[in-house]
């Protein structure tokens, strides 16, 4: 698997590649026409034309005679992957894992099965402990930009917390990616103990809903209710 450091580096390189390719397209695209307002980069630069989104194959085939760019793309994107099942989604979120050095072991949420069943599962979190969340996912077909994971936490029907984790940008890979959140401290005290409902979303800059699911969380004095 790919660890967090590799993912962060890959995300930064992917963004650089996208910017370089967008600049190249911008310089070579001479067609006229009026763009929708949301596609304008800056009203102060009326000549700007937002480049169209390119597929991974188009990026790999772009400027084959530019040796430096070809080497850069090969180092960044790796070899061309074998064809994948077209029915597979571009992004697959496979697991969410709660990690704490104070826990008996990792708490793993399998996201490949029936998501509705997670509503009936309750994951226990001991109050006051330090913990991290690891998100495991795959990218199958195209580069995806600005992945993020959101958690909305509810108690008695009212939202009491919203967490947003910026996961980054990734290219297709035969291996799973892992993203680990910064360390957080679980709430503590009699007022926060009890049951919560969490609605989680995995989305991107294009607002594509790659996955959404609901699960139960219970904060108590120990790792067992």
Swiss-Prot record:
> GO CC annotations?
cytosol; membrane
Where located? Cytoplasm
GO molecular function ontology, one term from the record: Rho GDP-dissociation inhibitor activity
Tell me the Gene Ontology biological-process terms attached to this UniProt entry. Rho protein signal transduction
Q: Disulfide bonds, which pairs?
A: none
SUPFAM superfamilies assigned to the protein according to its UniProt record, in alphabetical order? E set domains
Q: Which InterPro entries match?
A: Ig_E-set, Rho_GDI, RhoGDI_dom_sf
Q: What keywords were assigned to this record?
A: Cytoplasm, GTPase activation
Q: Mention any Pfam family matching this sequence.
A: Rho_GDI
Reported function: Inhibits GDP/GTP exchange reaction of RhoB. Interacts specifically with the GDP- and GTP-bound forms of post-translationally processed Rhob and Rhog proteins, both of which show a growth-regulated expression in mammalian cells. Stimulates the release of the GDP-bound but not the GTP-bound RhoB protein. Also inhibits the GDP/GTP exchange of RhoB but shows less ability to inhibit the dissociation of prebound GTP.
Under PANTHER family, the record lists: RHO GDP-DISSOCIATION INHIBITOR, RHO GDP-DISSOCIATION INHIBITOR 3
* Family statement: Belongs to the Rho GDI family.
* Protein name per Swiss-Prot or TrEMBL: Rho GDP-dissociation inhibitor 3
Species of the source: Bos taurus (Bovine)
Gene name of the encoded protein: ARHGDIG
């Amino acid at each position: 698997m790919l660890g967090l450091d590799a993912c962060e580096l890959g995300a930064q390189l992917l963004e650089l590649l996208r910017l370089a390719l967008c600049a190249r397209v911008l310089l070579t695209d001479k067609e006229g026409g009026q763009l929708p307002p949301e596609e304008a980069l800056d009203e102060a630069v009326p000549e700007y034309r937002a480049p169209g989104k390119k597929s991974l194959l188009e990026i790999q085939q772009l400027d084959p005679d530019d040796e430096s760019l070809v080497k850069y793309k090969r180092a960044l994107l790796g070899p061309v992957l074998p064809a994948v099942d077209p029915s597979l989604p571009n992004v697959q979120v496979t697991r969410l894992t709660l990690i704490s050095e104070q826990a008996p072991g990792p708490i793993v949420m399998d996201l490949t099965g029936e998501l509705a069943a997670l509503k009936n599962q309750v994951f226990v979190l001991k109050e006051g402990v330090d913990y991290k969340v690891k998100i495991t996912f795959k990218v199958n077909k195209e580069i995806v930009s600005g992945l993020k994971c959101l958690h909305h936490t509810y108690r008695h029907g009212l939202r009491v917390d919203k967490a947003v984790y910026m996961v980054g940008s990734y290219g297709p890979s035969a291996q799973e990616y892992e993203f680990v959140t910064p360390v957080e401290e679980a709430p503590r005290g009699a007022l926060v103990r009890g049951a919560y409902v969490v609605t989680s979303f995995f989305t991107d800059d294009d607002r594509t809903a790659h996955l959404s699911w609901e699960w139960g969380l219970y904060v108590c004095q120990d790792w067992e209710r």
